[in-house]
Amino acid sequence: WKPQFTFNLAGLVSVTHQAGQSKDIDLNEAFLSFRSGPAATRFSARAGVFWPPISLEHGGSTWQVSDSITPSAVNSWVGEEVKVLAFEGKLEHRFGDQSLALTAAVFEHDDMAGTLLTYRGWALHDVRLTVGNHFPLPPLSASKAPYQAPVTNPFWDVDGRAGYYARFDWRSPWPVSVNLLRYDNRGDQVSGRQLQTAWRTRFWNAGAMASLGQRTVAKAQVLWGNTLVGPDTPFGYPADVDFAAAYLLLSREFGGGKLSARGDWFKTHDNSFVANDNNNEHGWSGMLAYKHPLTHFADVFVELLHVESDRPMRLANAALPAMQNQTQLQTALRVGF
């Protein structure tokens, strides 16, 4: 639902159905947005529940991937653990054939961001976090299980502290745009309820998009940061993990549709208690996808995805091979009105 109250004031309410989740039908996003009139310098703002402006793959009123079925590792994680209740403002100035923009926001919620990334690791899928949804965790080590629930609710707010993010954009005179974002949920690391504790999760995200001729577009993102929980001890934090991921995506109009190829790289580095709880991981993935329009409101997708990763805790906690690889071929029909 996208009500347009005036030229300057609009809204969006998005509800999604995802079979097999803790809430099959739930609120996706809901916010009011404002934009100033046409001018060289413009201001816009929004307030409500939404994803921060991180992904270059997602868009539209339902925050879906535009050129494939499965997003990158970077944006799969953003989709499942980085949703906020926020007030966001953006100031943009155009000069000549280029522009600069600064976006800043203060938010609450998203206290549990980092739990999945630490205890499960990276994943590639199209499941998105909704307001009331929770995700199951894999089997935990004996040292962690007494202090962590078997599920995580990433959107919860348990410490009452506000976080922030800020983003800088430059649209160059050439068909190239770049952006840099800093995110910090400012979790206090000790507040909690129902065996879920506020995590301190901070990261940088750098993105770029370029047109390579009339029919080809390249997109890339690099995300790196740290997440930790619990009090500092002489032996380190109970959980303290550095993480990083990147992808390069090339899309070309082909045969009346669009062909996309993407390569992903991702890793985590555990900084504490590795002997008892080794959350190190490294892996990569490759994807080929073809999107073909059937009508002006329906598209069909075919996607081939291969993922390989090495994570020691799979063997230690779940008796699964630490080194895993999967190949998936899937199709999807997407209808929009």
Whereabouts are the PLM-identified features?
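Short C-terminal domain-edge/linker segments immediately following a structured domain
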Residues: R46, N75-K83, H134-P138, G187, ...
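Residues that flank catalytic or metal-binding motifs in active/ligand-binding sites
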Residues: D26-N28, F43, G59, K83-L85, ...
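Outer membrane beta-barrel
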Residues: W1-R120, D169-V176, L249-R252, K258-D264, ...
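Loop-centered beta-sheet repeat module
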Residues: A142-D188
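Outer-membrane beta-barrel pore domains
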Residues: A30-F34, P38, H58, P175-F337
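Flexible glycine-rich, low-complexity coil/linker segments exposed to the extracellular/periplasmic environment
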Residues: G114-G121, H125-D159
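Short Gly/Pro-enriched turn/cap motifs at secondary-structure boundaries
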Residues: S76-E80, W156-V158, Q196-A198
